[in-house]
């Protein structure tokens, strides 16, 4: 399992998890489906995208 914990400027916590199944990672944000990726590099790219979308000033 891959996990990244993010906090926004209001102190809200966002848990981003990648759970392995059938050779791929299902990416969830606070236990809600986000996407499916093939490896840790793609997971890290998804985390960066989540930061851009949800933490933009």
Show the residue positions of the predicted features.
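Short intrinsically disordered terminal tails
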Residues: 1-2, 52-57
């Amino acid at each position: 399992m891959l996990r990244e914990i993010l906090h926004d400027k209001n102190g809200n916590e966002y848990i981003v998890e990648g759970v392995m199944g059938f050779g791929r990672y299902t990416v969830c944000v606070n236990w809600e489906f986000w996407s499916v990726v093939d490896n840790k590099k793609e997971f890290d790219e998804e985390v960066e995208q989540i930061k851009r979308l949800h933490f933009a000033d």
